[in-house]
């Protein structure tokens, strides 16, 4: 069996790392991949937004299953194209992918099906949105979101009216996010603990992976601007078995039923960003693919074979999988370039990788890296994810930080508090 993974980040490295353990050498291909992936799979340079080029690659390589990492190919309709060509692909159709590609669509979908989420209003007219801010329609802080895909940077939490008005102007008048900000969602600010919930879906049924928690802000103690994610841990002590049942009953099942009734059954990975409020779980956002950096913490927990589950889900015939999952805590810490998520320099040599790759219960997943001669150099904002695992969160955290402290490059930035929330929760539970 041959598998194709699309993408070039640490998420895709984690996916390839897992699948490469289940298949003979050379059976897992990644496009375009990165230097870390190239050590365990075959990388083919390719623009994955060019859907026809991806389809041609899948045909020429006799690919049995394609797994889509990032959201853009899904939003462009790669699953629809592959389905017409009779090619198996793990991911939702373009229509179903609107759960992520349009926040307005997602909010309206949830409202129609009574799926718990924040109160909201959609605006495309700046004066109307500013009027809502001045009236304090949703109170303060207030959350403003660009409707379309904005690379994880399209959300602004405004603490007061002046900040909210400026956010409205930057989105709707100055077009800060381009076409992604033609309309915006304004919603109430929710209080509680955030969690990420992954479910593999076959259109009718869903199988949950261990819940995780992300760390979006650039600095310790959740300070500074939002990023794509500076670290994650799993399993989340906040997501108890009873809460998991509520998430399935109040969110996952209504999503699957609603999309099935609309004629667009959801097959693929459904990522539910949750706020665990005092009244129960509420949806912050949907993503239609594996999250980054949560995937780096979650996938190593799956000790059984993942490929058969993904293939069965893609074909709409998953049923109830039987797959072994570790209970050991896993902690993923991101090493980023100085200046990220703003402008940052790249091209610095990365040291310490060989030493870290020999450490037990540690995994290194490449993101913004490039091979230059014999050296690995920085090539992006988020450079690497380092994952530590252990019998307790104390051990997993210590492993992750011991490893990441061996890695060197000019301007390396690391949050020092990844996993501390889990530590406090597990100690008080």
Can you describe what each PLM-predicted range is?
Residues 246-270, 287-359, 370-372:
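Active-site "cap" helix and flanking loop/linker of ATP-utilizing ligase/carboxylase catalytic domains
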Residues 154-295:
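Internal nucleotide-binding/catalytic subdomain
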Residues 369-373, 377-429:
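Generic C-terminus detector
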Residues 4-5, 99-183, 213, 237-253:
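Active-site nucleotide/adenylate-binding loops and adjacent lid/helix of ATP-dependent enzymes
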Residues 21, 36-38, 60, 90, ...:
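Solvent-exposed alpha-helices and their adjacent loops that cap or buttress functional pockets
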Residues 53, 163-166, 342-344, 391-398:
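Short, conserved charged micro-motifs
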Residues 1-95:
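ATP-binding N-terminal substructure of ATP-dependent carboxylate-amine bond-forming enzymes
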């Amino acid at each position: 069996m041959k598998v194709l993974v699309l993408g070039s980040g640490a998420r895709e490295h984690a996916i390839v790392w897992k699948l490469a353990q289940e298949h003979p050498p050379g059976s897992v291909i990644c496009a375009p991949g990165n230097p870390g992936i190239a050590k365990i799979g075959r990388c083919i340079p390719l623009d994955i937004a060019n859907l026809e080029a991806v389809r041609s690659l899948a045909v020429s390589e006799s690919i049995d299953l394609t797994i889509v990492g990032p959201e853009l190919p899904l939003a462009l309709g790669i699953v629809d194209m592959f389905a017409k060509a009779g090619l198996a692909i793990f991911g939702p159709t373009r229509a179903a992918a609107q759960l992520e590609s349009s926040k307005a669509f997602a909010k309206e979908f949830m409202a129609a099906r009574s799926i718990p989420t924040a109160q909201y209003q959609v605006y495309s007219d700046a004066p109307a949105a500013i009027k809502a801010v001045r009236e304090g329609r949703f109170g303060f802080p207030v959350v403003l979101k660009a409707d379309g895909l904005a690379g994880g940077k399209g959300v602004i939490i405004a603490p007061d009216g002046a900040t909210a008005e400026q956010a409205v102007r930057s989105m709707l008048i100055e077009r800060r996010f381009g076409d992604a900000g033609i309309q915006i969602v304004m919603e109430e600010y929710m209080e509680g603990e955030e969690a990420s919930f992954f479910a593999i879906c076959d259109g009718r049924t869903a199988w949950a992976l261990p819940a995780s928690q992300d760390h979006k802000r650039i600095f310790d103690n959740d300070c500074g601007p939002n990023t794509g994610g500076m670290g994650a841990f799993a399993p989340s002590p906040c997501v108890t078995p009873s809460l998991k049942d509520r998430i399935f009953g109040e969110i996952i099942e209504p999503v699957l039923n609603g999309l099935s009734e609309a004629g667009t059954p959801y097959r693929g990975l459904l990522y539910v960003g949750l706020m665990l409020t005092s009244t129960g779980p509420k949806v912050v956002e949907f993503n239609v693919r594996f999250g980054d950096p949560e995937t780096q913490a979650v996938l190593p927990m799956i000790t059984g074979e993942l490929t058969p589950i993904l293939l069965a889900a893609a074909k709409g015939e998953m049923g109830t999988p039987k797959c072994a999952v570790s209970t050991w805590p896993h902690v993923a810490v991101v090493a980023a370039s100085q200046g990220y998520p703003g402008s940052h320099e790249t091209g610095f040599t990365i040291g310490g990788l060989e030493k870290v790759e020999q450490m037990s219960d540690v995994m290194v997943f490449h993101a913004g890296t490039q091979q230059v001669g014999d050296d690995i150099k920085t090539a992006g904002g988020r450079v690497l994810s380092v994952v530590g695992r252990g019998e307790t969160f104390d051990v997993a955290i210590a492993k992750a930080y011991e490893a990441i402290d061996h890695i060197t490059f000019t301007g390396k930035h690391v949050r020092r508090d990844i996993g501390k929330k889990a530590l406090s929760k597990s100690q008080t539970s």
